Amino acid sequence: MSLSLAELEEVLRERRREAPPGSYSATLLSDPERVSRKLLEESFELGVELMRPEVDRERVASEAADVLFHTLAGLVGAGVPLDAVLEELAERRGRPRPE
């Protein structure tokens, strides 16, 4: 079973809207500072895993999942749709890099 980023985005929007008791996502989405702190923490942890001399693919996948989850939570919290990010990436494709 797989979950697309768009599906995860929709789940997060639903959690924000409904705020079910005990939901980690709902709690996270109610506090933008907490989302930011978690994103920084998870990004750091992913970076650490990627710097290891022998990369543990399972750990990298786990940390990358945390980064993607918290990135989407931040986007949902800020009202920025995933499509806006994908459009930005598409616009960058083929654009010369600044020197």
Located regions from the model:
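Flexible "arm" and connector segments at domain edges
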Residues: 1-64, 68-99
